[in-house]
Design a protein with these regions (language model features):
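Conserved AMP-binding/adenylation subdomain of ANL enzymes
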Residues: 2-90
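Short, flexible loop/turn elements at secondary-structure junctions
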Residues: 1-2, 24, 133, 143
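Conserved AMP-binding/adenylate-forming
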Residues: 41, 79, 85-170
Length: 170
C-alpha cells in the first residue's frame, strides 16, 4: 500500500464523515468493493486502470461491448446538454463495484487521462493528487469544487511548493 492512499483513507473518514476503505490487494479489489460498498476510496493508478480494463474486458467477453459504446455516446451527448444520467445508464457497472462508488482519490504515480476520463464517463469521479512519503505524503490534490482533468490539483493548505529550475512546461 502507498502512503498517499492511507492518508486519503484517513482524510475521507475524517473530512467526508464516512469510513475509509482500503482493499486488501489488487486481486481482491472487486470482492472488497462488493463486500464493503464504499462511496469513495483511495487507490494507486494501477487499481483504477485494472478496474477500467476489467469493465471493458467483461463487456467484450459477454458480447456487450457495442451496447457499452452506445451507452457512452448517449451519456456524453446528454452531458453536453447538462443532463447527467451516467449512474443510471451504467448502473450495472456501478453495482458491480459495490453499488455506491462515486469517487476515487488517486495518487502514488501518474494516471493516464484515458482512465480518469473513462471512469468519469461511467459516473465515477477520479480526484488525482500528488505526494511523496517524505512530504506527509500528500502535497497537492484536485478538488471537486475546482476540478481540472489531468491535473494533480492545487497545494494542500499546509504546503508551500516551489518549482526549482522550471522548464518550458512549468
Amino acid at each position: 500500500h502507498h502512503t498517499f492512499s492511507w492518508v486519503g483513507c484517513l482524510f475521507s473518514g475524517n473530512l467526508l464523515t464516512e469510513w475509509g476503505f482500503i482493499c486488501r490487494s489488487l486481486k481482491d479489489i472487486q470482492k472488497d468493493l462488493n463486500t464493503y460498498h464504499p462511496q469513495n476510496f483511495s487507490a494507486v493508478p494501477l487499481a483504477i486502470e485494472t478496474i477500467y480494463k476489467k469493465i471493458w474486458f467483461t463487456a467484450k467477453k459477454s458480447g456487450r461491448e457495442d451496447i457499452l459504446k452506445k451507452g457512452l455516446k448517449i451519456s456524453n451527448f446528454l452531458m453536453k446538454l447538462g443532463i447527467d444520467r451516467r449512474r443510471k445508464i451504467f448502473s450495472e457497472i456501478i453495482n458491480n463495484l459495490g453499488g455506491n462508488l462515486e469517487m476515487i482519490v488517486c495518487g502514488g504515480a501518474y494516471l493516464d487521462e484515458k482512465y480518469e476520463k473513462g471512469m468519469y464517463d461511467f459516473g465515477i469521479q477520479i480526484i488525482n493528487g500528488y505526494g511523496i512519503t517524505e512530504c506527509s505524503p500528500a502535497v497537492t490534490c484536485n478538488r471537486l469544487d475546482a476540478y481540472k482533468p489531468g491535473s494533480v490539483g492545487i497545494p494542500l493548505p499546509c504546503n508551500e511548493i516551489k518549482i526549482k529550475d522550471p522548464d518550458a512546461d512549468g
